C-alpha cells in the first residue's frame, strides 16, 4: 500500500498514541518534581512521531532512513525513562499505564525497524527521484522478475531432474 500522507502511516499513528499516552502519564504528581524527567520524557516520546513525519516528507529514501533511525532511538529513550520511573516506589499506582506505554514504545520500535529494513532493500531512491522513466524501469524490472519466477516454477515441473529440491 502506498501512503500519500504521514498521518495515514500505521507506525506514525502508533507513535502519536505513544506521545499522547506519555503526556497523560506525566500529568501525575510524581512527575511534578524538580528536574527534567517530565520534559525529557515528553520530548523523547513526541520526537518519535515528529521524526517519522519529517523523514516521510523529505522525499528521498536515504533521508527517510536517517529520520527513522532517529525516531527509533527516541523510542528507546522513551522506554528507558519509563523503566527508570518504574524503579521508584512513588509511581506504583502508574504501573499498568507505564507497562502499556513500554509495550507501545516497543511496538513502535519494531514497526520502524521493519520499515527501515524494507527500505534498505529497495531499489527506489525515494519519491523525489521518481519520474515516469524510473517508474517504468522499476515496473519493467518487477514484471521481469515475476516472469522469471513463473518460468522457473514451470520448468521445475516439466524438468525436475534439472533442478535440485527447493530448500525449506
Indicate residue ranges for each PLM-predicted region.
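Amphipathic alpha-helical assembly/interaction segments
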Residues: 1-168
